[in-house]
Every structure is written in structure tokens, then in C-alpha cells.
């Protein structure tokens, strides 16, 4: 895919921010228009994150126009909004490869460009990292500026406020920009508000403010009175948020129109020269400039390939996803039990909870991007006699590890974790792979860990976790289910596996949705196949029987080999004194890069062909079959 650059006369001249800074200010509106159109054309042909980037076009242009990037350091939080940044920093021609194998990364990535200061993927890290970068720059004394751009969702996380609190105390020179795209431009974002913001960000006001503070430091009562007067003025003229950020030690400016390129350039030019921590609050519209995305910013957050003229996204008529299987199960339970509570850390759509949130609003909690809080909130509900279900992506559960141990497991509370996107997730790459959850949960006492091989098993395991009265986790992958028949719900025997096929010499112990590959291979190799179901407690009796009756055991999982389910089998064999040869197949000891799920599994040797080759090579090394 290549865009016709004849349609983008100004953008075609921009191969770096240095080129951008050669333009006249009056050319910037046209550049923004071309950049927005180019982004739409590119993403519609490749898939990717669209609505967020459409909303940050003017901000991106203004930042690279005013700041001397990469000398000045620009940090994007998460990175969904950073596509325009990639286009302006020398990667325009590579946008056709974004989120693809060997292509450019979906998020800012240090190894990809000197303009990507921080590699990101998870939210709310920008201010903490930015503060560290700003402190380092301050010690270099080279005049380097630091800017962090964070969204209104990401700033709700505790980590962001921890960083704001620290930055305000240190008084380090840095600028935090809040990209607030929750609502359309509000009434107080207009000419008067922009004028006031320019006054408060200007050098005269800053000089008077700093000079007055030095004088009034010697007269505390007057100093306190003037401080409160300034905060009151800002609260009246700007927004209630100003008082909060001023109390944290920041000079707050805003909210201002994030789509007015002239005002943004003027504002940032003023703020670049201010000392101490600065906070600029801009209002933007997610999906700006493309009507379908403005109307449905959630639907156009991440999109497949689509027709930009009609704006219609392709419908998925295939088998239901595991996320939908979970959502349907949760609704089914809520119909019978008013005490079941669904909790999500800002992933309602992705986790399949839209219908549940609409049908059972009193049993639904979206706690925002606050994974730690989500888990301990569930702890409190469990103590109160309710049955909390935390729906969370595997990669995000990492952020609540202490709460999982300290608040849930130690107290042995009945909290069910529905762990979505376990294993290979595909195009979002290393930051989003669900590679570690088995490993980091398996060592926690009191945990029950289940690995369904299909959607019916997934439902039964969710029901088992809901009924068991202990901390329990069910991990399932991104994507469509297998298509098996759903059976009535019943509680599975805890810690027991199921024998699928009986063979000779080779036994494949499957954990999760790679079972179809195991079954296909079993016909070729005349292998026994056991669906282990439980990683913890693991079926020790079955493992010992298989070790006694087979020459080779093979474990199969979409989790890191180190500390994973295969390691649990190895521990059983060791403690039982069994010397049966064991091959552990799973994810290797490196971060898995972006690719489709199928490409990644093939590259890792975890597709059917790769598994067969690994088994045969292992047997060859051990001796003849």
C-alpha cells in the first residue's frame, strides 16, 4: 500500500521535524488537514488505532514545531495517539507496515526512532518516566526540555498522580499536557478562555508571579492569602481541575482548544520558557475530522481494514470470541445471582462486558485504568459477601501483582479472575502478549489456575471458579472460539484432568487452546493426549501414571516456559523420582514481537508443524522411538 503523495503537497515535504520547522505558521493549518487525511487513508488500508490519532493532529504539529525534537524530549503515554508523531518523524513511508510482522511498532518504540524517547504500551507511565528524564536533563544543564502527553483516561491511574505529586515537590522544569478528549469542546473553551490562558502562560505573568513569591516568602500570612487568591482566580477563569493541579505544585493553564493550531503554537511557545512544573489542559475531539469516528470514537479506536468513504467497519460473522463467551456467561450468572459483580479496569468493550453493563448496571463497575484498585476493590466486595469477577487482560494483571498476593490470596478470598488475551495476542506486540500469567500466579498459595481448551471448557471453568470459594483464575486467548457445542454448566472436579486420546510411548499434556494441534499430531505419532485443565492444583496422579506408562512426556502451553505449566510437571516428576524424558513447549525467554497470532505461533514452532518437528527432534536426541 502506498499513498499518492500528490494529494499531500505539504506533507510530502516533511521527512523530519526540522522540515516542519521550516514552514511558515500560516501553512500549519493546511499541513494539519493533509496529515489527518493521510492518517485516515493509511489506517483504513492497514488496520490500527485511528480515532486517538485523528484527535492529536494539531497538538503533534504544534509540539514538533515549537520544541527542538529530538533534543527536546517528547513522551507519549500509551501511544495510541502517536500515529501523527510517527508520520512526522521520518516514518511516513513505513506506515503501511504498522502492527505487522517486521513492520513499525504500533506504539512509540526506542529501538525504532530517536524521536521515541520512551517505549510504551501500558498506560500512565509517561509522567513518571518524564520526571526522571527531566531531572537527568536538569543535571546536564544543556537546556533540554521535557514534555509528557497523557490522555484523560490514563491520568486517572494512581501512578500518574504519584508522579504529579513528586514532580510538584521537586519543582523540576517539565510540561505535562493533558489531552482531554472525553467530550466535545465545552463552552468555556473559546476566545476569552484562550486569551486568558495566553496571559497566564506568558513571560510577564510568570515574571511577576515568581518575583512576588520571592518577596512574599518573607511574609507568610500575605503569601498564603495571595496563593489562595491566585488559585481562586484560576478556578473561576479556567476550570475546577486547576485547583487540583495547582495544589500538586503545577502551574495550570487551560482548558484550551486542542484543535486551534495557532493558539497551540502561541501557548507552547510561551510555556517552553517557563520554569518549574507546568500543566497544559487541552480539549480535543477523538476522531476529529472524520464524521464516523467522531460519532463512534470507541468503535473507531482500533479498526480493521475498512472503506473510509462509507465509514462502515466490516462485520465479523465468524464464531464468537472468547470475550463474548465470557460476557454471555456473566450475564447468565447475573440473571440468577444478584451478588455476582463484574469489574473491569476500563476495558468494557474489549472484555465483552457491554451487554452485562447495560443489563445489570448495579452489578457492574468500571474502575478506570486502575488495576491495583480493581483487585483490592474486589477484595472488599468478597469480604462483604459478594462474588466479584475481575475481567482483565493478562498483560494488565501484571500491574496488580501485589494486590493479587497481599489482598486476595493471603486472605483466601473468593475472587474470580477472568484473564483475557492470555498467550499470543498478535499485532500489539511485546507490551501486550499474555506470556507470564501462569508463571507469576503459579507460585501463589491458595490460587486455582485453569486453562480451557475451547469455549465450553471456558464456561465450565468460569462456573467452577465462581463456585469454588477460593481465589481462582481462568485464562483464555484473544480471538474466536473453536465452535464446539455448549453444555449445561457444572462444577469441574478441582485439579483433575481429562484423557482425550490414548496412545503409546508419547504423551502430550495440553494446557489451553493448542489442543487441536495436539490432537492432529496424536494421529501421526500415536500419542496419548491429556487435556490437563488445571495448572494449579495440578493433576499429580495423572502425571505419575503417564510417566510410568510412556517414554516421553510433552507439555504444551501459550505461556513462558520458565515457571509455566511445563515447569509444574517437571516439579512433579522430580518430587516423585521419575526420570521420564520431558519436553516443555511454550514461549521462549524473550519478548515476543508483533505479528499475527498465526505468524507468531509458526515463528515460535508452536503451530502443528513446529510442534511435530520439536517432538521428533527431542526423541531423536533421546534415542530411537
UniProtKB/Swiss-Prot annotation:
Annotated InterPro entries: Dxylulose-5-P_synthase, THDP-binding, Transketo_C/PFOR_II, Transketolase-like_Pyr-bd, Transketolase_BS, Transketolase_C, Transketolase_CS
Enzyme class: transferase
Biochemical pathway: Metabolic intermediate biosynthesis; 1-deoxy-D-xylulose 5-phosphate biosynthesis; 1-deoxy-D-xylulose 5-phosphate from D-glyceraldehyde 3-phosphate and pyruvate: step 1/1
EC number of this enzyme: 2.2.1.7
Catalyzed chemical reaction(s): D-glyceraldehyde 3-phosphate + pyruvate + H(+) = 1-deoxy-D-xylulose 5-phosphate + CO2
Endpoints of the signal sequence: none
Cofactor(s) recorded in Swiss-Prot or TrEMBL: Mg(2+); thiamine diphosphate
Ligand binding (Mg(2+)): 152, 181
Metal-binding recorded as keyword: yes
UniProt keyword annotations, A-Z: Isoprene biosynthesis, Magnesium, Metal-binding, Thiamine biosynthesis, Thiamine pyrophosphate, Transferase
Cofactor binding description: Binds 1 Mg(2+) ion per subunit.
Keyword Cytoplasm carried by entry: no
Matching NCBIfam families: dxs (TIGR00204), PRK05444.2-2 (NF003933)
Record-stated family: Belongs to the transketolase family. DXPS subfamily.
HAMAP family reported in the protein's UniProt record: DXP_synth
Role noted for this protein: Catalyzes the acyloin condensation reaction between C atoms 2 and 3 of pyruvate and glyceraldehyde 3-phosphate to yield 1-deoxy-D-xylulose-5-phosphate (DXP).
PANTHER family: 1-D-DEOXYXYLULOSE 5-PHOSPHATE SYNTHASE-RELATED (PTHR43322), 1-DEOXY-D-XYLULOSE-5-PHOSPHATE SYNTHASE, CHLOROPLASTIC (PTHR43322:SF5)
Name of the molecule in the record: 1-deoxy-D-xylulose-5-phosphate synthase
Amino acid at each position: 500500500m502506498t499513498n499518492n503523495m500528490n494529494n499531500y503537497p505539504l506533507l510530502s515535504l516533511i521527512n523530519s521535524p526540522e522540515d516542519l520547522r521550516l514552514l511558515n505558521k500560516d501553512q500549519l493549518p493546511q499541513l494539519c488537514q493533509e496529515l489527518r487525511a493521510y492518517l485516515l487513508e493509511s489506517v483504513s488500508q492497514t488496520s490500527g488505532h485511528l480515532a486517538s490519532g485523528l484527535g492529536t493532529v494539531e497538538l503533534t504539529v504544534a509540539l514538533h514545531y515549537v520544541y527542538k525534537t529530538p533534543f527536546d524530549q517528547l513522551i507519549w503515554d500509551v501511544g495510541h495517539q502517536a500515529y501523527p508523531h510517527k508520520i512526522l518523524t521520518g516514518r511516513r513511508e513505513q506506515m503501511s507496515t504498522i502492527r505487522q510482522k517486521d513492520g513499525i511498532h504500533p506504539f512509540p518504540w526506542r529501538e525504532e526512532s530517536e524521536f521515541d524517547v520512551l517505549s510504551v504500551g501500558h498506560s500512565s507511565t509517561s509522567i513518571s518516566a518524564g520526571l526522571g528524564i527531566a531531572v537527568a536533563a536538569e543535571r546536564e544543564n544543556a537546556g533540554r526540555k521535557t514534555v509528557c502527553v497523557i490522555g484523560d483516561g490514563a491520568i486517572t491511574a494512581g501512578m500518574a498522580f504519584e508522579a504529579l505529586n513528586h514532580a510538584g515537590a521537586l519543582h523540576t522544569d517539565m510540561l505535562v499536557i493533558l489531552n482531554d478528549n472525553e467530550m466535545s469542546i465545552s463552552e468555556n473553551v473559546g476566545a476569552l478562555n484562550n486569551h486568558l490562558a495566553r496571559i497566564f502562560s506568558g513571560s510577564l505573568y510568570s515574571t511577576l508571579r515568581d518575583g512576588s513569591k520571592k518577596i512574599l516568602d518573607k511574609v507568610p500570612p500575605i503569601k498564603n492569602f495571595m496563593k489562595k487568591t491566585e488559585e481562586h482566580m484560576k478556578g473561576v477563569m479556567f476550570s475546577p481541575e486547576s485547583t487540583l493541579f495547582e495544589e500538586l505544585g503545577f502551574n495550570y493553564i487551560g482548558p484550551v482548544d486542542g484543535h486551534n493550531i495557532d493558539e497551540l503554537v502561541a501557548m507552547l511557545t510561551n510555556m517552553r520558557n517557563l520554569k518549574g512544573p507546568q500543566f497544559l489542559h487541552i480539549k480535543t475531539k477523538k476522531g476529529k475530522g472524520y464524521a464516523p469516528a467522531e460519532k463512534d470514537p470507541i468503535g473507531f479506536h482500533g479498526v480493521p481494514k475498512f472503506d473510509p468513504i462509507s465509514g462502515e467497519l466490516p462485520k465479523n460473522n465468524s464464531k464468537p470470541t472468547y470475550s463474548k463467551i465470557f460476557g454471555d456467561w456473566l450475564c447468565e450468572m447475573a440473571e440468577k445471582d444478584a451478588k455476582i459483580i463484574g469489574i473491569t479496569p476500563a476495558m468494557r468493550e474489549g472484555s465483552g462486558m457491554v451487554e452485562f453493563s447495560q443489563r445489570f448496571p448495579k452489578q457492574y463497575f468500571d474502575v478506570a485504568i486502575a488495576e491495583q484498585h480493581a483487585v483490592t476493590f474486589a477484595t472488599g466486595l468478597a469480604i462483604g459477601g459478594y462474588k466479584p469477577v475481575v475481567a482483565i487482560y493478562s498483560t494488565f494483571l501484571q500491574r496488580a501483582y501485589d494486590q493479587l498476593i497481599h489482598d486476595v490470596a493471603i486472605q483466601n478470598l473468593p475472587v474470580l479472575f477472568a484473564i483475557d488475551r492470555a498467550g499470543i495476542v498478535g499485532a500489539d506486540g511485546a507490551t501486550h502478549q499474555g506470556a507470564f500469567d501462569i508463571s507469576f500466579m503459579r507460585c501463589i498459595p491458595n490460587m486455582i489456575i485453569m486453562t480451557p481448551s475451547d469455549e465450553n471448557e471456558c464456561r465450565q471453568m468460569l462456573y467452577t471458579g465462581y463456585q469454588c470459594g477460593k481465589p481462582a483464575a481462568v485464562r483464555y486467548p484473544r480471538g474466536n472460539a473453536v465452535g464446539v457445542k455448549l453444555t449445561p454448566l457444572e462444577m469441574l472436579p478441582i485439579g483433575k484432568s481429562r484423557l482425550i486420546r490414548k496412545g503409546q510411548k508419547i504423551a502430550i499434556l495440553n494446557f489451553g487452546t493448542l489442543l487441536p494441534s495436539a490432537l492432529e499430531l496424536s494421529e501421526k505419532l500415536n500419542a496419548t493426549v491429556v487435556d490437563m485443565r488445571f495448572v494449579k492444583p495440578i493433576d499429580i496422579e495423572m502425571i505419575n501414571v503417564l510417566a510410568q506408562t510412556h517414554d516421553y512426556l510433552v507439555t504444551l502451553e501459550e505461556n513462558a516456559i520458565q515457571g509455566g505449566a511445563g515447569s509444574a510437571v517437571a516439579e512433579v516428576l522430580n518430587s516423585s523420582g521419575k526420570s521420564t524424558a520431558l519436553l516443555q513447549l511454550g514461549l521462549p525467554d524473550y519478548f515476543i514481537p508483533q505479528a499475527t497470532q498465526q505468524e507468531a505461533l509458526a515463528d515460535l514452532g508452536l503451530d502443528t508443524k513446529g510442534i511435530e518437528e520439536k517432538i521428533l527432534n527431542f526423541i531423536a536426541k533421546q534415542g530411537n522411538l
